[in-house]
Amino acid sequence: MSILDDIIDDTRELVEQRKQETPTSELKERPFYDEREPLSLAEALKERGLSFIAEVKKASPSKGVIRDPFDPAAIAQQYAEHDAAAISVLTEPLHFEGALEHMAWIRAHVPETPLLRKDFIIDPYQLVEARAVGADAVLLIATALDPGQLAELHAAATELGLSCLVEVYEEEDLDKIDWEQVSVLGVNNRDLHTFEVDLDNSLRIFDQTPKGVGRVAESGLSDPETLVRLRKAGVNGVLIGEHLMRAEHPGEALSRLRAEGKKIAAQQAG
């Protein structure tokens, strides 16, 4: 079995357990569920230039613990102060040491920046969970879903007011997508079966996608020259996690990466 298969199996068990512990009716009574309208991820990515989705992540299967001590709310506040277009929050507990509580803590401290629940969404129950802890958007991984599941989850998320970042890795994943449904597409440079990284994967995949869909490159991004290449190729946003998590001050690292990219772009244009 691949790493992705292991994670999906574990997620399936966790979801069934949480359904028993916290019914959907109880989730819908939580303050974040209906006291605020979710923010639009697509709108956040329309700002001029390359948008940054900054990630809050303690660990990963490929790297182990990345940041310790780990204060999710403080990190997210730094990102917001340094103009992240959106903030991605890992909530998967067994392989990434994430938690739904991290999202709720961050929402309480960062009210005006879109929050993306980054997890392995396989059940509509997880969408209600996301809304209940203050998420504005969810990640839907096409590799982990069949076309029917992907369409069903996307429709259910939209009905709840949540944006979707639909993620692909392989060209075959594109065949699963209803392009009338999807407004933001992410391409993961990391193979979720092996966790190996190919930084050119985004460029290859985006070259085959329709115009008008928001484009987000994900994983393995830390070099400003690569970011400039992506922007020139029509990419709207980048999702960056490990590079920022390893910095002493993640927010400052975000601003520095953005500034270095702009400097390189200006030099190439001039």
From Swiss-Prot:
Gene behind the chain: trpC
Name under which the protein is recorded: Indole-3-glycerol phosphate synthase
SUPFAM superfamilies: Ribulose-phoshate binding barrel
Listed Gene3D superfamilies: Aldolase class I
Protein species of origin: Salinibacter ruber (strain DSM 13855 / M31)
Keywords per UniProt: Amino-acid biosynthesis, Aromatic amino acid biosynthesis, Decarboxylase, Lyase, Tryptophan biosynthesis
GO biological-process terms attached to the record: L-tryptophan biosynthetic process
Top-rank taxon: Bacteria
Family, similarity comment: Belongs to the TrpC family.
Keyword Amino-acid biosynthesis: yes
Pathway: Amino-acid biosynthesis; L-tryptophan biosynthesis; L-tryptophan from chorismate: step 4/5
Gene Ontology MF terms in the entry: indole-3-glycerol-phosphate synthase activity; phosphoribosylanthranilate isomerase activity
Matching InterPro entries: Aldolase_TIM, Indole-3-glycerol_P_synth, Indole-3-glycerol_P_synth_dom, Indole-3-GlycerolPSynthase_CS, RibuloseP-bd_barrel
Enzyme class: lyase
Keyword Amino-acid biosynthesis: yes
Chemical reaction(s) catalysed: 1-(2-carboxyphenylamino)-1-deoxy-D-ribulose 5-phosphate + H(+) = (1S,2R)-1-C-(indol-3-yl)glycerol 3-phosphate + CO2 + H2O
This enzyme's EC code(s): 4.1.1.48
A Pfam family matched in the record: IGPS
HAMAP family: IGPS_B
